[in-house]
Regions:
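Sec-dependent bacterial lipoprotein signal peptides
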Residues: 1-22
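A structural "domain/chain start" motif
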Residues: 22-94, 201-206
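Surface-exposed short loop/turn segments
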Residues: 24-43, 108-157
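Envelope-exposed proteins and targeting segments
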Residues: 52-54, 68-70, 86, 126-133, ...
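Short secondary-structure boundary motifs at beta->alpha junctions and helix caps
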Residues: 81-91, 157-196
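Structured, soluble extracytoplasmic/luminal domains of envelope-associated proteins
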Residues: 85-110
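Sec-exported extracytoplasmic/periplasmic mature domains
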Residues: 103-111, 195-203
Length: 206
């Protein structure tokens, strides 16, 4: 009798679990976003003397801990609070995305003279190294997106040649995709400033 009651209890519990499963919907797949790189056709010669064939290695790029998540972070501009959107994620680490866009932005501007920029993980010799420390990089749809970063340009042996701080904001579009697009444009503006600094460096010794 005891065995029968136990079997009935287990059967009832299993039925409840199966019934609950019928009403539970699986969590929706998150949307994935990637920081957009600049388009090559958007650039024209600016009349600045370029360093012929200059090679720049970008990295390390560091970000604050509050940004080091795959879920996209959105700031409430009124309450000055931030929140992670679990239904929207970066398709790569934010550090990798920032590095990629800066490399693309610099390469597009250095390419007319045969120059290029590449991540520090690439096994290539470089004339200069670019270190970037991101201090803030966030925003919200239909609100300002802010980028603040310290940077330094050094020789391959660590001698600091130039250093500075970039700080700018840009109004984002009404959707999350508009915020991501604004983040990409801010990085490209940052890349333009960095390239102007690179263009003032002495010719590299090889």
């Amino acid at each position: 009798m005891k065995i029968l009651r136990t079997a009935l209890a287990l059967t009832g519990a299993l039925a409840c679990i199966l019934l609950a499963g019928c009403f539970l919907k699986p969590a929706p797949e998150p949307d994935y976003y990637v920081l957009p790189s600049p388009e090559a056709q958007s650039y024209v010669a600016e009349g600045i003397t370029r360093l012929a064939g200059c090679r720049v290695v970008v990295g390390p790029v560091t970000i604050p801990g509050y940004l080091d998540h795959l879920p996209i972070l959105v700031r409430d501009p009124k309450a000055n609070t931030v929140a992670l959107k679990n239904d929207a994620r970066w398709s790569e680490s934010l550090t990798a995305g920032i590095t990629r866009v800066l490399c693309d932005s610099l390469t597009l501007r250095l390419a007319p003279s045969g120059g290029s920029a590449f991540p520090m993980e690439t096994a290539m010799n470089a004339d200069w190294r670019l270190f970037v420390n991101i201090m803030r990089f966030d925003g919200a749809p239909d609100a300002p997106v802010a980028l603040e970063a310290d940077w330094s340009l050094t020789t391959p042996y660590g001698e600091v040649l130039r250093h500075g701080r970039f700080k700018d904001t840009l109004k984002a579009g009404p959707e999350l995709s508009g915020m991501v697009a604004a983040m990409g444009r801010l990085l490209d503006t940052f890349g333009a400033q960095l390239e102007r600094e690179i263009s003032t460096l002495p010719a590299p010794r090889r």
